[in-house]
């Protein structure tokens, strides 16, 4: 019977030591959750960078293989046109913002400030 109590004490101490390592030791549950969050953030960043890389790779391929991409870039970025081609630039009017009347100035034309109740 004495051996049974000794074994129970050893198992309780072992359980206590394992719990301490789980909660406070290296690689504890808090660190694991923090690392999982970092992995999630890094995977999201990697996905965005992969999409950017795919778009750049497609653009490089298009520039190597097709003349239309080179022509489009020359037109939009460098302002080039083909010989004999006419270039028309359409300039849109700037939006007109209505002028707000100043404080104490009546909103209707022809009213005198003394006439306003």
Curated annotation (Swiss-Prot):
Stretches assigned to the Cytoplasmic side: 1-6
GO CC terms of this entry: cell division site; cell septum; plasma membrane
Periplasmic-side positions: 25-117
Membrane topology annotation: Single-pass type II membrane protein
GO biological process: FtsZ-dependent cytokinesis
Keywords per UniProt: Cell cycle, Cell division, Cell inner membrane, Cell membrane, Coiled coil, Membrane, Transmembrane, Transmembrane helix
Coiled-coil blocks: 29-69
Record has Coiled coil as a keyword: yes
Domain of life: Bacteria
Record-annotated membrane-spanning stretches: 7-24
Primary localisation category: membrane
Location in or out of the cell: Cell inner membrane
Cross-referenced InterPro entries: Cell_div_FtsB (IPR023081), FtsL/DivIC (IPR007060)
Pfam (any one): DivIC
Family note: Belongs to the FtsB family.
Assembly and interaction partners: Part of a complex composed of FtsB, FtsL and FtsQ.
Function summary: Essential cell division protein. May link together the upstream cell division proteins, which are predominantly cytoplasmic, with the downstream cell division proteins, which are predominantly periplasmic.
Protein name, per record: Cell division protein FtsB
Annotated organism of origin: Stenotrophomonas maltophilia (strain R551-3)
Lineage start: Bacteria, Pseudomonadati, Pseudomonadota, Gammaproteobacteria, Lysobacterales
Gene (UniProt): ftsB
């Amino acid at each position: 019977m004495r051996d049974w109590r000794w074994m129970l004490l050893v198992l309780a101490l072992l359980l206590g030591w394992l719990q301490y390592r789980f909660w406070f030791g290296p690689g504890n549950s808090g660190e694991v959750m923090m690392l999982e969050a970092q992995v999630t953030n890094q995977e999201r960043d990697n996905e965005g960078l992969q999409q950017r890389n795919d778009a750049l790779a497609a653009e490089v391929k298009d520039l190597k293989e097709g003349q239309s991409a080179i022509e489009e870039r020359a037109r939009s970025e460098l302002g080039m046109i083909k010989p004999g081609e006419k270039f028309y630039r359409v300039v849109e009017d700037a939006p007109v913002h209505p002028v707000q009347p100043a404080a104490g100035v009546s909103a209707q034309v022809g009213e005198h400030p003394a006439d306003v109740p």
